[in-house]
Amino acid sequence: MPNHASAKKMVRVIGKRTLSNRVRKSRVRNSVKAFVAALEANSPIEDAIAAFRKAESNIHKCVNKGVFHRNTAARKISALSGKLKAYDLARLQNEQ
């Protein structure tokens, strides 16, 4: 239990930040799941690209707010981009 007023305030502030960061991380996880679901459902490439852009946007927002380190975000976006590229190549090969 904090004894000083500043420590008590920091407990409150940290609680608010934790809640906000949890919401942001959840938003990223949900958008990534939606992107993966779009790939697994063999949806049109336009839908997959839209889901990718939404996930990428949410990840960048987390970087701007200090929730993710920029290298973590780059790694996540790179992995998603690789999945999108592989999906596109697989669709092109199946069409031929």
UniProtKB/Swiss-Prot annotation:
<keyword id="KW-0689">Ribosomal protein</keyword>
<dbReference type="GO" id="GO:0006412">
    <property type="term" value="P:translation"/>
</dbReference>
<keyword id="KW-0699">rRNA-binding</keyword>
<dbReference type="GO" id="GO:0003735">
    <property type="term" value="F:structural constituent of ribosome"/>
</dbReference>
<keyword id="KW-0694">RNA-binding</keyword>
<keyword id="KW-0687">Ribonucleoprotein</keyword>
<dbReference type="InterPro" id="IPR002583">
    <property type="entry name" value="Ribosomal_bS20"/>
</dbReference>
<dbReference type="InterPro" id="IPR036510">
    <property type="entry name" value="Ribosomal_bS20_sf"/>
</dbReference>
<dbReference type="GO" id="GO:0070181">
    <property type="term" value="F:small ribosomal subunit rRNA binding"/>
</dbReference>
<dbReference type="GO" id="GO:0015935">
    <property type="term" value="C:small ribosomal subunit"/>
</dbReference>
<protein>
    <recommendedName>
        <fullName>Small ribosomal subunit protein bS20</fullName>
    </recommendedName>
</protein>
<comment type="similarity">
    <text>Belongs to the bacterial ribosomal protein bS20 family.</text>
</comment>
<comment type="function">
    <text>Binds directly to 16S ribosomal RNA.</text>
</comment>
<dbReference type="Pfam" id="PF01649">
    <property type="entry name" value="Ribosomal_S20p"/>
</dbReference>
